[in-house]
């Protein structure tokens, strides 16, 4: 049984993925009391798995370069970049959406002035407005993008919306939904060949859980 390395996004998706792994009998005991550890042995009679926790944007890199065979990461991260791997499963967890949001006075089609859009996801925002045939100025922000329209930095924002509470608390409204997103499983292309049996087993078992 070949060793399979899984890169898992820290935080919210980590917890959701661990629940799925438990269901298919992957040994997650070390993850339940992890302290400051980053690498975990999840081996048992059914699986030979090594799992490590990384930031969302790094999951793709680990998988693309073969340091990880499998990755669990949000679709938002995949949409923003253009890396080489197989996207094999929608895990149906971590659901939220991309949306255009602004102050209530904002009008998307008002006037000829170029709109300023603040976002952590410039590639996604650029593609959204390209499809609308609109030229906009994109302002990349790493922190709380909701602040942009409030202080006059931007006319609107493109960001992830889960409950909408943060928008409401800051006086913003959703102007338009862009797309639904959720957690995905990705696989290194070479690993799919060299560790095919082990990886297919994981994919099939996780698929069964998702269908239930």
UniProtKB/Swiss-Prot annotation:
**Cytoplasm as a keyword?**
yes
Q: What class of enzyme is it?
A: transferase
- InterPro entries for this protein: ATP_PRibTrfase_cat, ATP_PRibTrfase_CS, ATP_PRibTrfase_HisG, ATP_PRibTrfase_HisG_short
Mind telling me which PROSITE patterns this protein's record contains?
A: ATP_P_PHORIBOSYLTR
Task: State if ATP-binding is listed as a keyword.
Answer: yes
> How is this protein annotated for GO cellular component?
cytoplasm
Q: Tell me the Gene Ontology biological-process terms attached to this UniProt entry.
A: L-histidine biosynthetic process
The pathway entry for this protein reads as: Amino-acid biosynthesis; L-histidine biosynthesis; L-histidine from 5-phospho-alpha-D-ribose 1-diphosphate: step 1/9
Which controlled-vocabulary keywords does the entry list?
Amino-acid biosynthesis, ATP-binding, Cytoplasm, Glycosyltransferase, Histidine biosynthesis, Nucleotide-binding, Transferase
Check the record and name the SUPFAM superfamilies matching this protein. Periplasmic binding protein-like II (SSF53850)
Question: What Enzyme Commission number(s) does the record list for this chain?
Answer: 2.4.2.17
As one GO molecular function, the record gives:
ATP phosphoribosyltransferase activity
Predominantly, its location class is: cytoplasm
The cellular location(s) given in this protein's UniProt record come to:
Cytoplasm
Gene3D superfamilies, alphabetized: Periplasmic binding protein-like II
Catalyses:
1-(5-phospho-beta-D-ribosyl)-ATP + diphosphate = 5-phospho-alpha-D-ribose 1-diphosphate + ATP
**Assembly and binders:** Heteromultimer composed of HisG and HisZ subunits.
Q: According to its UniProt record, which protein family does this protein belong to?
A: Belongs to the ATP phosphoribosyltransferase family. Short subfamily.
Known role: Catalyzes the condensation of ATP and 5-phosphoribose 1-diphosphate to form N'-(5'-phosphoribosyl)-ATP (PR-ATP). Has a crucial role in the pathway because the rate of histidine biosynthesis seems to be controlled primarily by regulation of HisG enzymatic activity.
Present the record's domain note. Answer: Lacks the C-terminal regulatory region which is replaced by HisZ.
Q: Identify the HAMAP family for this entry.
A: HisG_Short (MF_01018)
State what protein this is by name. ATP phosphoribosyltransferase
